Amino acid sequence: MSASRTSVAALTSGAASAADSDASGDEALEAVYRQAGVPSTIPAVGEPLSCMLRDAARDFPDRVALDFLGATTTYSQLETQVARAAEALRGLGVGRGDVVGVILPNCPQHVVVAYAAWRIGAIVAEHNPLAPAAQLREQFHIHRGRVIIAWEKTLERLVAAVGSLEAAGLGGLSVYSVDLSRHLPLRSRLALRLPVAAARTQRRELRGKIPAGVRSWDDLAASAIPLATGFPLPSVSEAAALLYTGGTTGTPKAVCLTHENLRSNAEMSLAWASGTTSVGKETFYAVLPFFHAFGMSLSLLCAVGLAATQVVLPKFGADLVLAAWKRRPATFFPGVPVM
């Protein structure tokens, strides 16, 4: 009994010492953060995601928002493109709480579609454009979005894999294609037309055969009138995105995130970096995929929250990154160790 009591007392004493140690460690860390200018708390989110773009365009209208392989879009231009895309979505019957399926690599159209959907209170369901056809079909079934905006190459691959859009789970849906070359610099677009092997290879990397019945999202969005500025904003408590888990413990699952969830993540990240970043002066490399929580939070959201320039790369490649660096060096590079 004595030994037992001694053991319990020792364990209790050890636990208390550990708790005290943890508490003192937390206080020490907080002091370090405070010294670095990182606040211990941040204000609660009061506005939806689209207001981040509104504020950046208002304060830095002429700053480059997007650099896509050398073609640039200012914040003023981006805001206008988003307003047109938002009205285009409304014309397709998309409204508050409706799901828009997005199957795109990192590209200007991805940024525009996401902020357009958020502006009108729609939910962005993100999909990996390289995911297997069966996995995508299951994800379409889960969210039941009526509008799908997809990369041409993904649509071509799905039809090649299963035979038709219907077999891919897209039957009866409004499916629109995105041409990645549309936002290249003019010189690059013209070079793609050259009858040489290098041009053909690059065309195959960027574009794909569009299945019958699929219309151009690029044309639709460009021809739409801008959304009225007074159009009501969604509440921060409303759903904004469906992101799919990695599937390491089974079938990927859809995780629903609200405007408050996503913007809180962004605001906390910006608070962490507040001592080393300046609004309107940073250059982010958007290499992490937007369809992943990491890429969405630190590139699609944080960069806009800082009115930063995003150097948007459709995939990671050392050659692409180094070429971009010569043109526009990064000040902020969210990445993973292998990069």
Where are these regions (language model features)?
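Structural core segment of the AMP-binding/adenylate-forming
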Residues: 2-17, 21, 91-92, 119-219
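Conserved AMP-binding/adenylate-forming core of the ANL superfamily
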Residues: 43-45, 54, 62-93, 98-107, ...
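Conserved AMP-binding A3 loop
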Residues: 74-76, 240-267
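Conserved structural elements of the adenylate-forming
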Residues: 79-84, 224-227, 255-276, 287, ...
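A short helix-loop-beta submotif of the ANL/AMP-binding
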Residues: 86, 99, 105-125, 129-133, ...
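Adenylate-forming
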Residues: 105, 150-160, 178-184, 288, ...
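Conserved pre-ATP/AMP-binding loop-to-beta segment of ANL
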Residues: 194-244, 251, 276-283
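Conserved AMP-binding/adenylation subdomain of ANL enzymes
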Residues: 263-283, 291-334
